[in-house]
């Protein structure tokens, strides 16, 4: 697990590097599906002092199998998403400013241009709010459940992120670094959407044919963006 712990550590350290977290407001995890184990950031440990060996290994029930610290308080959310969506290899949660603003406003991040369409096929959805019973009960688990309720059976890698109402963004990818990449893009397109709608409040969504072109040339079966 040492290699995966190093990858998760590096991905977590990317969060302050890209300006996605303040203090300890974020976490990254990755899963080893063959072993059924997840590596995640320890709860409340400062990035300035954190080391790869500080990463915590848990099983799919959340039991700590390796590590001296308690795992992230959001571990149950990560595990619920891994259990539901086999294509996920890494998950990120942050409170990045612009994506969190959309979450607090209770609005999906609208697909307005090609930057968005290169990564997200359609709007980045916003979940419903959790009920008092859901919050007072298994809050983090129920956060995962409301994300799943919103995504349904859609392939999560086609829209690799969501904003949880009154909370903040979650992003995911094929591994930890890919998940962080998508979290960075989500924050940028959230900022772009806010600015664009401020300039033109009547702004419509990107044309569907243009969105399809940009997404499919990068992610479709005949994708031709980048190098082989």
Curated annotation (Swiss-Prot):
The keyword Isomerase applies. Keywords: Carbohydrate metabolism, Isomerase, Metal-binding, Zinc. The keyword Chloroplast does not apply. Belongs to the aldolase class II family. AraD/FucA subfamily. Pathway: Cofactor degradation; L-ascorbate degradation; D-xylulose 5-phosphate from L-ascorbate: step 4/4. This is L-ribulose-5-phosphate 4-epimerase UlaF. Induction: Induced by L-ascorbate. Repressed by UlaR. It comes from Escherichia coli O6:K15:H31 (strain 536 / UPEC). Catalyzes the isomerization of L-ribulose 5-phosphate to D-xylulose 5-phosphate. Is involved in the anaerobic L-ascorbate utilization. The lineage of its organism: Bacteria, Pseudomonadati, Pseudomonadota, Gammaproteobacteria, Enterobacterales. One of its GO terms (cellular component) is cytosol. Its EC number is 5.1.3.4. Substrate binds at residues 26-27, 43-44, 72-73. One of its GO terms (biological process) is pentose catabolic process. HAMAP family: UlaF (MF_01952). SUPFAM superfamilies: AraD/HMP-PK domain-like (SSF53639). InterPro entries: Aldolase_class_II_sugar_metab (IPR050197), Aldolase_II/adducin_N (IPR001303), Aldolase_II/adducin_N_sf (IPR036409), UlaF (IPR023499). Zn(2+) binds at residues 74, 93, 95, 167. Its cofactor is Zn(2+). Binds 1 zinc ion per subunit. It catalyses: L-ribulose 5-phosphate = D-xylulose 5-phosphate.
């Amino acid at each position: 697990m040492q290699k995966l712990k190093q990858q998760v550590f590096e991905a977590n350290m990317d969060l302050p590097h890209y300006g996605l977290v303040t203090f300890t407001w974020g976490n990254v995890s990755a899963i080893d599906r063959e072993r059924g184990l997840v590596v995640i950031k320890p709860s409340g440990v400062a990035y300035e002092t954190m080391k790869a060996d500080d990463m915590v290994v848990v099983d799919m029930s959340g039991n700590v199998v390796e590590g001296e610290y308690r795992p992230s308080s959001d571990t149950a959310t990560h595990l619920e998403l891994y259990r539901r969506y086999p294509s996920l290899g890494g998950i990120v949660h942050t409170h990045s400013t612009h994506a969190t603003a959309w979450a607090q406003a209770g609005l999906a991040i609208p697909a307005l241009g090609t930057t968005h369409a290169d990564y997200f096929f359609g709007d980045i959805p916003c979940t419903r709010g959790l009920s008092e019973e859901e919050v007072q009960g298994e809050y983090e688990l129920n956060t995962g459940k409301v994300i799943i309720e919103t995504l349904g059976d859609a392939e999560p890698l086609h829209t690799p992120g969501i904003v949880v109402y009154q909370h903040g963004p979650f992003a995911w990818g094929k591994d930890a670094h890919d998940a962080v990449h998508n979290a960075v893009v989500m924050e940028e397109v959230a900022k772009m959407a806010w600015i664009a709608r401020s300039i033109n409040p009547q702004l419509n969504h990107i044309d569907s044919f243009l969105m399809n072109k940009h997404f499919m040339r990068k992610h479709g079966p005949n994708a031709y963006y980048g190098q082989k």
